[in-house]
Amino acid sequence: MSRYFGTDGIRGRVGQGLISADFVLRLGNALGRVLAQGRDTRPMVLIGKDTRISGYMFESALEAGLVAAGADVQLIGPMPTPAIAFLTNTLRADAGVVISASHNPHDDNGIKFFSAMGEKLDDATEAAIEAAIEAPFLTVDSEYLGKVKRTRDAIGRYIEFSKASVSRGFTLRGLKLVLDCAHGATYHIAPMLFRELGAELVAIGVDPDGLNINAGVGSTHLETLAATVRESGADLGIAFDGDGDRVLMTDAQGRTVDGDDLLYVLARAWRASGRLKGTVVGTLMSNYGLEQALGTLGIPFIRAKVGDRYVHQALVESGGVLGGEASGHLLCLDRATTGDGIVSALQVLEVLRHEGLTLSQALLGLHKVPQKTVNVCWSGPARAAVEMPEVRQALVEAQAAVQGRGRVFLRPSGTEPVVRITVEADDVVLMQQTLDRLADVVRDAA
């Protein structure tokens, strides 16, 4: 088991444990040493971040650790996580680093890494970095220290990349959209891009102050987006999370359209156009209604473990190009190397424009089973929850209650100190009662 890396890099409360300036300094130094192995030239690393105030501190710490190890650094500033993945590849960097805690509040932060190809690091590289953290800090001789510069054209590069993900004739003229950028990394680039494509735009969550990222806005607070869509008479709403790798939507009535819904819209249209390849990949948490709807269309569907890295792995192994999670992590591997909220939104909008459908019309063939997830805070290691006898017994009873009619999942979060409980059943009352009973047991055990 990894000592430092979770399912999405390293994440936690600022100033505590691993998310401290001294640890991030050592982390940067470890990355620089791993990248420098077996080469005569200085490695080059891109650093991007979201808008939380602690990003300045960790940017400086990473920069210092990398430079001390003899690595050059390019500072990108606030940019979506997938933009850093793209830029790492196109600028021929040896690695990319993103300082972000995604959808978490401002007092959390984290570190994500990308390989030279713009993909998440493999387990072997993560293990090498962890081993290097335990080794003594290295400061190379002065003449071998790394150099630092700021990249000035990152925004333009990423906008052109995003526009290239749709057909040249694609336009949003005549469409009114509400865009919620969560006061996060997409706050400047997403409105610019969607306006360039011709949309009439109402933008919210675009005034970051370092402390308000994800606060009442973004993909984890769709009520703000839904209300704005209804009040403005928009055709639909689009919400990103704090670092821009997730996207969720609302239709014109403000109804939530999650990642399972968006997967269906894309899979159905791509199959008809011939773009869909291989298997569509969801996760263990994907709604059973999605699996049924895709099966009706003759589209193969498999489930990976929860986490976009596992979805990516399953897509590569199966030769697929489309996968994702209900949370809004969508992978369109024929367009981007990682989950990209902006690119995914453009793919959905391109389908709607091509077919002449509203978002609600595009979802008429999908009938989801009632499903609900609750998060129970857990003070200690969340993994311990699933091993407690009373919790295991309650889980067995919950699964028996919905046997033949639904599913129950209990899992520790890989990114937060919570236990996630999901119940799915063909009857909403059965679903809610089963969820409440299991959640009460977990809360009492916490």
UniProtKB/Swiss-Prot annotation:
Residue stretches spanning the membrane: none
Broadest EC class assigned to this enzyme: isomerase
Modification Phosphoserine, positions: S102
Domain of life: Bacteria
InterPro entries linked to this entry: A-D-PHexomutase_a/b/a-I (IPR005844), A-D-PHexomutase_a/b/a-I/II/III (IPR016055), A-D-PHexomutase_a/b/a-II (IPR005845), A-D-PHexomutase_a/b/a-III (IPR005846), A-D-PHexomutase_C (IPR005843), A-D-PHexomutase_C_sf (IPR036900), A-D-PHexomutase_CS (IPR016066), Alpha-D-phosphohexomutase_SF (IPR005841)
Alphabetical list of PROSITE patterns matching this protein: PGM_PMM (PS00710)
Similarity section: Belongs to the phosphohexose mutase family.
Biological role: Catalyzes the conversion of glucosamine-6-phosphate to glucosamine-1-phosphate.
Name the UniProt record assigns to this protein: Phosphoglucosamine mutase
Organism: Xylella fastidiosa (strain M12)
Alphabetic keyword roster: Isomerase, Magnesium, Metal-binding, Phosphoprotein
Any Pfam family hit: PGM_PMM_IV
